[in-house]
A protein has these predicted regions:
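Gram-negative and organellar
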Residues: 1-240
Length: 240
């Protein structure tokens, strides 16, 4: 539901991975005066993306909040905090995490699909529950590693990076034509040194008032203990 100042986001999903599980998400964005907006989001059993191992066998209960300040129309400041409880898809508790992210950016234009550059810094703290994994989660652990919760929970890190984004569409805004979008960036963290992210995709309508998005992403950074990860993403959104 979208009102004059407030936008609500309600979502439910069913995931097929190591185990099948449902998820719920509820969030709100509230627009204040002078280009300032506040937002929050609560999640139950949603996919955990803080590491590739969590993405494969984990999920999270999370709460995030923050604000976005559109300073001049092209320059902006965004701050977000996240509190996360990590669980295996079998239901076993794995640990928890807290992150703070600060973005300072500049848009090159005022179009709905904005192109811009941003400086981003993140501080992330993680704590693993100190106990062995159950048999199903242990099946994901290589034979030379200990089968405990440390396998899933990433290291705490501090990271700063510069990123160029282009062609990004606002989720709630319909677009009539197909467009390319992507992100290129470099970063450095205190745990894994220099890293990068590269993402390229296309999105546009298929049947009319809808949007299909296809993209590929490859990254290597402190967010995943310096490990390289690749993702192929397909999303479909129907407007009404």
């Amino acid at each position: 539901r979208i009102s004059t100042r407030s936008t609500w986001d309600v979502a439910a999903a069913y995931h097929q991975a190591l185990e099948n599980y449902p998820s719920l998400r509820l969030g709100q964005n509230y627009q204040l005066e002078s280009g300032l907006s506040l937002h929050w989001q609560a999640e139950h059993q949603t996919p955990a993306t803080d590491s590739s191992t969590l993405l494969a066998g984990g999920m999270q209960n999370a709460f995030s909040s923050g604000f976005n300040w559109n300073i001049t129309g092209r320059e902006y400041l965004a701050v977000q905090t996240d509190l996360k409880q990590f669980k295996g898809q079998t239901g076993q508790n794995l640990g928890n995490g807290q992150t703070v992210t600060v973005d300072i950016g500049h848009y090159f234009d005022h179009q709905p699909s904005k192109n811009g550059i941003k400086l981003s810094t993140r501080i992330a703290q993680y704590q693993a529950d100190d106990h062995p994994l159950d048999s199903k989660l242990s099946s994901l652990v290589p034979t030379h590693q200990a089968a405990n919760t440390d396998f899933f929970i990433p290291q705490s890190y501090k990271q700063i990076g510069v990123y160029w984004q282009f062609g990004e569409a606002q989720p709630e805004v319909y677009q009539r034509s197909w467009r390319s979008f992507g992100e290129l960036g470099v970063d450095v963290s205190d745990t894994s040194g220099f890293g990068y992210i590269g993402r390229l995709g296309f999105h546009g309508p298929v049947l009319g008032y809808d949007r299909l998005s296809l993209s590929m992403e490859q990254s290597q950074s402190g967010r995943d203990n310096g490990n390289q990860s690749k993702q192929f993403l397909l999303n479909y959104r129907l407007f009404y």
